[in-house]
UniProtKB/Swiss-Prot annotation:
Species whose genome carries this gene: Escherichia coli O9:H4 (strain HS)
Reactions the enzyme catalyzes: N-acetyl-alpha-neuraminate = N-acetyl-beta-neuraminate
Protein name: N-acetylneuraminate epimerase
Summary of subunit composition and partner proteins: Homodimer.
Keyword annotations: Carbohydrate metabolism, Isomerase, Kelch repeat, Periplasm, Repeat, Signal
UniProt-listed Enzyme Commission number(s): 5.1.3.24
Superkingdom, natural source: Bacteria
Amino acid sequence: MNKTITALAIMMASFAANASVLPETPVPFKSGTGAIDNDTVYIGLGSAGTAWYKLDTQAKDKKWTALAAFPGGPRDQATSAFIDGNLYVFGGIGKNSKGLTQVFNDVHKYNPKTNSWVKLMSHAPMGMAGHVTFVHNGKAYVTGGVNQNIFNGYFEDLNEAGKDSATIDKINAHYFDKKAEDYFFNKFLLSFDPSTQQWSYAGESPWYGTAGAAVVNKGDKTWLINGEAKPGLRTDAVFELDFTGNNLKWNKLAPVSSPDGVAGGFAGISNDSLIFAGGAGFKGSRENYQNGKNYAHEGLKKSYSTDIHLWHNGKWDKSGELSQGRAYGVSLPWNNSLLIIGGETAGGKAVTDSVLISVKDNKVTVQN
């Protein structure tokens, strides 16, 4: 990786145009989900609660319009995708009817023509939180994410502990003090066929599952970038799924954001350049883990990356910077660029702005 960037390159990469990319979101927006269909952007959930909004990016007077509220309750870390004109929302973390925080494995469908939601009679074979979703040949594919039983059990224990700080400390120590493989993050690839509403096994990673990875796909290839290897410990790994031909192939590319990696980063493609930007992590956690400290991020402060990396000639190059570190927003393809909507910055503060990252001749332009 080229660790040296000239002042001119940074200046070009950090250029902010006078006009805003998109109007500010109606509420500070993080940990939600979003999708784009026919140049109309849809965002919702996360810090927006059950609210959903749309914005026509081609309209002369661009503005966010409120849609019908999501019927499944407030959720973080859900994913969404458009297939054949309908918006599908997968899983997420929220509260059940008893008020307990849990991982969901359900699917909701939104019809833009009628502005209405319906909960499908379809459940994924495992929970969906921290997972990624992408579309290929008319099907939605899901991989990664936390283990539903382990995650739900953790929050059940916290609920029973109430406000007993000593018990809460013990629960946290017990939860975080395990090796990565003991969290059983999902390494299976599942496919969802909207025509039948059936889930199918589509393969599995030869390595390990992650949570909070960035995902982007083009044609027959999909890339999963970084994410958590276990709670509090990120990975710098990059996985490529290649659907070319009849057999799905998994490839491991050169790492990025080394050595600690990030979660909640942003990925996209501009003029055939693969982009990875932002994300959050704990510097020093990888070294702690390698030295035998399973609770690797204990006592460490979460940091937010400003780095913009490009995949070029078989390696990652740091090619620019965001104006501020951010993570856990929405990544969407728009105008042959990577569109970032919302996210959080230092201290977990949710933001309302958008960022557009474009690449031409391996030079990055950032528009705020």
